[in-house]
């Protein structure tokens, strides 16, 4: 079986960066590190770090898990992120 390399992912757009900014803000308010967040949602620290640095985008499932772990409202996070780029 031949495994084809995946195509490079596009850089996160404005909205994806706004979402990660909201997540970083919530983490800072709660004094939660990237390593702690990774453990809370069952992802690797590297996976979370790349997304917090806007090198990749969080998925919708990631956002749902992160909001649940941080006690944040997912809809509010999305609305706040959207308003920050308009």
Q: In which residue ranges do the predicted regions lie?
A:
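Short alpha-helical DNA-recognition segment
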Residues: 31-50
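Residues within the helices of the helix-turn-helix
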Residues: 24, 35, 64
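Residue-level detection of the helix-turn-helix DNA-binding "recognition helix"
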Residues: 28, 42, 53, 82
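A short, Lys/Arg-rich alpha-helix, primarily the initiator
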Residues: 1-31
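Short C-terminal boundary/hinge segments that cap the last helix of small helical domains
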Residues: 5-6, 60, 71-86
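Short, basic-rich loop-to-helix N-cap that marks the start of a DNA-contacting helix
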Residues: 55-68
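The alpha-helix within a helix-turn-helix
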Residues: 27, 38, 67
């Amino acid at each position: 079986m031949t495994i084809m390399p995946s195509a490079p992912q596009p850089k996160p757009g404005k909205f994806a960066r706004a979402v990660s900014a909201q997540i970083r803000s919530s983490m800072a308010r709660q004094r939660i590190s990237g390593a702690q967040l990774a453990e809370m949602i069952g992802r690797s620290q590297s996976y979370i770090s790349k997304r917090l640095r806007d090198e990749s985008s969080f998925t919708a499932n990631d956002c749902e898990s992160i909001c649940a772990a941080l006690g944040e409202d997912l809809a509010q996070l999305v609305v706040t992120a959207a308003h920050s780029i308009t």
